[in-house]
């Protein structure tokens, strides 16, 4: 620990040749030399050989998330998180920042745990863990702040949700839609309309999906991450259930957009 910042230290003798084997598995998967199933099986075998190798569990968790298996992802991520937590002194209250490569396996495992809870709709757990990762790594290289507002809204903490959504809407288009929904639920229809129109301007695909077109045609323009079809699809797949509870909000969006 230095200047209230923690850094994991892994002696070379801890994982030995397993580190090289792990990197070979990652390279083989990245270059399509092995299938997703082969990749997962190899990672599982390595995890059995060395249960304290945090990054193996983290990568397993992301592989399960890609397979839309959030329970398996959560199980893998929690194993990595537990291995890391055993190395953190109980009295530690500082930062664990991404800038130090040794910290990244732990932060990857923590973020995978958040994503798994998001997909399992365990919103309170997702908020608690997101607060934790943002305290550890305020620079937020992984983008946890782009989950926090939506998760807070779904826990019913509207006041804090508004604060987070308002702060980050300019950098993340789905937050304009979330902000609009929050205003609509509060009966603030003019503010809702303003937020939704910001959303239409920054990511039109989300509006298309909320209006019933679940497969919008990609526009022939270059989008940044926030305005992309991928972002819209991820948002709709993850957060549309709350919209489904308020058909009048969907009608309002449809009326504004069309």
Where are these predicted regions, by residue range?
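Long, ordered, amphipathic alpha-helical scaffolds
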Residues: 2-4, 181-258
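TPR-repeat structural position
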Residues: 34-36, 70, 77, 123, ...
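TPR/TPR-like (Sel1-like) alpha-helical repeat modules
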Residues: 71-86, 131-140, 166-173, 184-208
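Flexible helix-coil transition and linker loops at the boundaries of alpha-helical arrays
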Residues: 10, 45-49, 81-102, 134-136
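TPR alpha-solenoid repeat register
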Residues: 56, 90, 109, 143-144, ...
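Alpha-helical segment of the N-proximal tetratricopeptide repeat
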Residues: 15-49, 111-119
């Amino acid at each position: 620990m230095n200047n209230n910042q923690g850094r994991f230290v892994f002696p070379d003798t801890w994982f030995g040749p397993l580190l090289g084997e792990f990197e070979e598995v990652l390279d083989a998967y990245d270059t399509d030399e092995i299938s997703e199933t082969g990749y997962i099986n190899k990672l599982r075998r390595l995890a059995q050989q060395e249960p304290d190798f945090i990054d193996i569990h983290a990568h397993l968790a992301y592989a399960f998330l890609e397979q839309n298996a959030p329970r398996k992802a959560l199980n893998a991520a929690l194993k990595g998180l537990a291995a890391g937590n055993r190395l953190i002194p109980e009295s530690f209250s500082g930062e664990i920042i991404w800038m130090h490569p040794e910290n990244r396996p732990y932060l990857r495992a923590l973020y995978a745990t958040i994503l798994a809870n998001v997909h399992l709709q365990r919103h309170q757990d997702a908020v608690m863990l997101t607060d934790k990762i943002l305290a550890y790594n305020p620079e937020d290289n992984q983008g946890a702040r782009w989950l926090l507002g939506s998760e807070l809204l779904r826990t019913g903490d509207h006041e804090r949700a508004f604060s987070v959504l308002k702060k980050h809407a300019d950098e993340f288009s789905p937050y304009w839609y979330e902000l609009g929904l929050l205003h609509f639920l509060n009966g603030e229809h003019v503010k809702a309309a303003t937020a939704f129109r910001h959303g239409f301007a920054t990511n039109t695909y989300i509006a298309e999906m909320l209006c019933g077109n679940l497969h919008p045609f990609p526009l022939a323009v270059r989008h940044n991450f926030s305005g992309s079809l991928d972002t819209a699809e991820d948002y709709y797949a993850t957060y549309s259930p709350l919209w489904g509870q308020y058909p009048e909000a969907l009608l309002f969006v449809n009326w504004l957009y069309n």
